[in-house]
Amino acid sequence: MEIRVFRQDDFEEVITLWERCDLLNPGVDPEVDIERKLTHDPDLFLVAEVVGEVVGTIMGGYDGHRGSAYYLGVHPEFRGRGIANALIARLEKKLIARGCPKIVLIVPEDNDATIYMCEKLEYEDRHQESVIFSKRLIVDQEY
């Protein structure tokens, strides 16, 4: 397995993977999301590749205060092999190198496998201390 930075020729494979992993949301065009990411900290957009196939992704961000991770997904046939752990670990290293003191992962509350993995990686469940609100500022064309 190789963890590397997203490349332009990964577009189709990544979007297909996101569809398989049920990571796409209504009103969010994944191509536009990727294009936006490529204009800001593209080196924090990582893919896991096995024998030339993209099997995992994580899209990180850092605003100078906190790090964040989105689009963490691993192809169903490749789960349980440590790929998500490796993606998170590589992102953490990149964020630490930038001086990032903390990272936030937002995981759907019904995703037991990812919650278990986060707990094993010593992430704390902080949902009782705050509520997450979001507001879509730009609605992409329906995907």
UniProtKB/Swiss-Prot annotation:
UniProt KW Hydrolase keyword: no
EC number per UniProt: 2.3.1.-
Recorded GO MF terms: acyltransferase activity, transferring groups other than amino-acyl groups
Pfam families to which the protein is assigned, alphabetical: Acetyltransf_1 (PF00583)
PROSITE patterns in the cross-refs: GNAT (PS51186)
Residues in N-acetyltransferase domain copies: 1-138
HAMAP family recorded: Acetyltransf_YpeA (MF_01127)
Protein name: Acetyltransferase plu1384
Organism name: Photorhabdus laumondii subsp. laumondii (strain DSM 15139 / CIP 105565 / TT01)
